[in-house]
């Protein structure tokens, strides 16, 4: 059995470059096996950057890797956009779906516009949505037309996974033991994107304080497209009837008290990209006040959005048209969301009593001292210092060095 499997594998890889695996993205004829293994390990740990650059030295396998990526949407057949349904009226391009019809097979499908994709934990990648945002109802989408792609691709769908940093080998004392000094400008170029979803449970006696507002405007949390203030997404206060007058005083609602629960989203410049509100009570029985007005604005937007989705998709389903599995799933989901008798569960799989506010945050994560950097030939190091651009060496042509590494490491790594 083992012999047969080996013979089958030998036929599969015979004459193929695929046997080199991830090392096709490095220069296998210029490095030894230890550095090749190091590069392969580092490749598994990389985070997609907000803005990538094409490598100056191509191995010619970068685009092949990008071709098999799932981080872009290429249209498979010629389609027409039947409808564009937006979730937020005041920010129509934040979240929406396109309902399309295949002009060859007459099958209906949906395309969801998202800011990015969340992967394991909070890791993820951002989409470039410029093209899909420019499309309108009635427009034809051509075959092989790319509607959106991750920031690892350029407009020609060429793949990149890092940046080209102007580097200098020297004996700077801050570069000992594989330490690396980078400039402020390189720090910004190495910004990555993460996505976090925060769920805030609100009981009958809970209110969100006026953390984002002022004495004229009550605002509990950032609106779509707004940045988070001081790493705090929202501040929940449980009202005790014995001190309700104190807790609900306008001045105190703009403060964070010791008994409050603050929802933090640390480590980055954060922006809200999506909001959902789930309610297990009859909304008509909940008194609307200034404390929950912002929450119910988003609840009303979500219900209106999914009501329109359910109505539009329902017409397609009831006519007996051909439609995709994605369309069928969204039709069922939208029906659940607008069903007043459907009960939602919390993170503990228990039906909650009042409201859960779900906020999706896009986080811009910059480099800090202690961050790891890796090159394309199995080289790596830890950032020891981030210097101002004017403190970095300057070349005869006026360019500033972006990264300083230890010259003694060259000989040491050649022997590794």
What are the residue ranges of the model-derived segments?
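Conserved phosphate-binding elements of NTP-dependent enzyme cores
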Residues: 343-344, 354-416
């Amino acid at each position: 059995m083992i012999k047969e499997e080996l013979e089958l594998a030998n036929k599969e890889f015979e004459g193929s470059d695929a046997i080199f695996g991830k090392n096709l993205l490095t220069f296998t004829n210029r490095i030894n096996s230890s550095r090749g293994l190091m590069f392969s390990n580092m490749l598994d740990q990389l985070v997609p950057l907000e803005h990538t650059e094409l490598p100056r030295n191509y191995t010619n396998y970068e685009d092949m890797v990008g071709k098999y990526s799932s981080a872009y949407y290429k249209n498979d057949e010629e389609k027409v956009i039947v409808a564009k349904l937006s979730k937020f009226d005041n920010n129509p391009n934040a979240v929406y779906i396109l309902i399309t019809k295949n002009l060859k097979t007459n099958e209906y499908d949906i395309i969801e516009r998202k800011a990015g994709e969340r992967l394991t934990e909070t890791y993820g990648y951002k989409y470039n949505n410029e093209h899909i945002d420019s499309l309108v109802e009635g427009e034809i989408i051509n075959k092989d037309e790319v509607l959106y792609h991750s920031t690892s691709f350029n407009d020609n769908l060429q793949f990149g996974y890092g940046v080209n940093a102007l580097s200098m080998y020297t004996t700077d004392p801050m570069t000992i033991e594989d330490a690396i000094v980078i400039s402020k400008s390189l720090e910004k170029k190495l910004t990555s994107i993460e996505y976090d979803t925060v769920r805030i449970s609100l009981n009958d006696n809970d209110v969100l304080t006026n953390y984002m507002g002022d004495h004229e405007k009550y605002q509990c949390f950032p609106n779509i497209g707004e940045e988070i203030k001081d790493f705090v997404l929202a501040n929940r206060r449980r009202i005790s009837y014995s001190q309700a007058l104190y807790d609900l005083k306008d001045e105190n609602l703009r403060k964070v008290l010791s008994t409050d629960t603050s929802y933090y989203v640390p480590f980055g410049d954060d922006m809200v990209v999506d909001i959902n509100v789930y309610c297990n009570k009859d909304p008509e029985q909940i008194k609307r006040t200034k404390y929950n007005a912002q929450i119910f604005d988003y609840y009303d937007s979500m219900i209106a959005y999914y009501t329109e989705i359910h109505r539009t998709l329902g017409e397609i389903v009831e006519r007996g048209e051909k439609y995709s599995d994605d369309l069928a799933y969204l039709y069922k989901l939208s029906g659940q969301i607008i069903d007043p008798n459907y009960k939602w569960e919390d993170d503990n799989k228990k039906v909650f009593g009042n409201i859960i506010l779900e906020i999706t945050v896009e986080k811009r994560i910059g480099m800090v001292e202690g961050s790891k950097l890796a090159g394309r030939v199995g080289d790596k190091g830890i950032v020891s210092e981030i210097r101002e651009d004017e403190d970095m060496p300057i070349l005869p042509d006026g360019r500033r060095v972006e990264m300083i590494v230890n010259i003694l490491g060259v000989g040491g790594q050649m022997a590794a």
